[in-house]
Amino acid sequence: MKAQHLFFAGMLCLAGCIAIEPTTRIEFTAPDSYPEGVAYDSIGNNYYVSSARLGSVGKVSPDGKYSVLHADTTLKSTYGMKVHPDGKRLFVLAGDANYSKYTNPATRTKMIRLIGIDLATGKRLSDLDLSALVPGKHFGNDMAFDEKGNTYITDSYAHAIYKVSPDGTASVFAKDKMFETEGIGLNGIVYHPAGFLIVDNTNTGQLYKIDIANPQNVQKVTLDQFFVGADGLLLDSPTKLTVVVNGGNDKIYQLESEDNWKSAKLSASTLIADRFTYPSTATKYRNETWIMNAKFNELVDSNGVPSKTFAIQKAVLKPLPKSKEKGKD
């Protein structure tokens, strides 16, 4: 019996000593770029990535070849991006919120622009200044499209959501006291086909549901926990939402809702062993979820050496074990 116990103990030790490898990564070389946004283009079979340091927009092939699609230092930093529903344009948010190599007092926390780029040529097709919509500081962070082609944009410093119609008309869509917080507020945003937006707040970890037809109707989504450090969002299905969390946690979570997002519960997450490095945003490749590792933790280290390589990493969400019912083994 003693020998048997020792055998099983040895097997457990061996299993514990086997290192769990991180999930698949697409590594690419783009020195000092620090990409925050990522968007997959199913037509061109490429990923597009932004740059918080250089303000450029890059293209990454599935095998990790990087090339610059659009470069303009006046953009300062580029953040959230989405391939337009027409499949021909890439919409990108540009500003000077924090990490730009080209920052200056005239634009620092003042600039917020929505750029439209031709995917075929890399040329800029549109450039919309949103800074006059709300006075004060600005940080254009993320965006979502509805089924009519309207664009909804989060401004993390102005605590507002803007709406840009297909003809380029910009307006304040929603601004509520509940959005207000210190530091980075509203961030990730998705459109739900039932006719509402879901938005997260980085500093508070709260989610909000906002009615498209009545944007004054802002509701907190009841959660079983808060997701402080919440960044990008991705709607996987009408009942499932992926939340990217960074700032020390560096994990990806999936929430599920059974009541049309009045409330939601945590249902799955990635593993610590996946070792995401300041994950920021998510995109879909077929049925898979891929995450941009922004590495922003390096930008607050004054002694750090700027990275040359970055990675888009596959998120494998593991279902959480269901809690046992009371009174049952």
Placement of each model-derived feature along the sequence:
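A short beta-strand motif characteristic of beta-propeller blades
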Residues: P22-T29, K65-A71, K123-L133, S171-T181, ...
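Beta-rich, blade/repeat-based domains predominating
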Residues: A30-G44, A52, T74-N98, S131-T151, ...
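Short loop/turn segments immediately following the C-termini of beta-strands
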Residues: A52, G95-A97, S156-A158, T202, ...
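Structural signal for beta-propeller blades
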Residues: G55-G58, Y99-S100, L114, H159-Y162, ...
